[in-house]
């Protein structure tokens, strides 16, 4: 295991989002099953933490941007700052939706169509953000998720207000279409990983990468699909499972997503104005972490390392040479021993 290779591509933004969603997905079924009697404002605490960190991080980043104009010419600083502003705008609309949801569940005084109104604005904004992101090669997971689900948001709001009386299985038709596409992606990765496993022209690193991607997509999509099917049957009263048992597959998907953040490049460097990779920033703030970060473990090449150590130990040792001018001791590397050239003899004629 190489900690440096593990953390150098770490994406803290996505890790924070998945961790907050995981904690929220644990508290919500406990509240729905009546195990805890907390207010929904408390159940949504992980979501509030997520949005608070987004707002604070963007505010600090904007302050650093305004006070240091020279930073604006560093690489893609301008593109990353604009991407941060777009993400903050989408998060503010999502925060408005979540506040309205909590208020509607606690008091029940307004229509669900009004609650979902921020999501109806998020979708066109996300479409514009996707167009901009594709032009600048940005990560677009959240924007794509919000833009393709506009029809799903409308169906759910109409069903909750009892304007339509469709079963939930029909209400979630847009979601089934999206999951079908994700299943095709999983099948694509499985086929390519099998082809790479049977190919002799592919290096082991590429083969391992494709197999890992296939396993990751399987453990994300399949449990997510199981969760959605169980939830729909529970809402339609086709089963009486507890919400905790229904949410277990979702926990597996979120845990897998959290694990994938350690190998996903990306992340905006302007959050909190750090202007560098998150792990590099941590190493500068906490220098003692470098001692662990410089250690690597390789359990698969012990024999080869022993052979190398033996060859190094058998190399001839060279006595140190004393330099008169520099007054330092110079020792040649034992692994790079070069015999001295022979003395040149020139025979002069009589």
UniProtKB/Swiss-Prot annotation:
Q: Superkingdom of the source?
A: Eukaryota
| Pfam family membership, one | Tmemb_185A
The terms describing its cellular component in GO are: membrane
Residues passing through the membrane, by range: 16-36, 41-61, 81-101, 111-131, 168-188, 211-231, 240-260
Q: Subcellular localization, per the record?
A: Membrane
Q: Note the topology in the membrane.
A: Multi-pass membrane protein
Statement: the UniProt record of this protein carries the keyword Transmembrane = yes
- Principal localization? membrane
| Keywords attached to this entry | Membrane, Transmembrane, Transmembrane helix
Q: Which family does it belong to?
A: Belongs to the TMEM185 family.
The protein's name in its UniProt record: Transmembrane protein 185B
* Native species: Mus musculus (Mouse)
State which gene encodes it.
Tmem185b
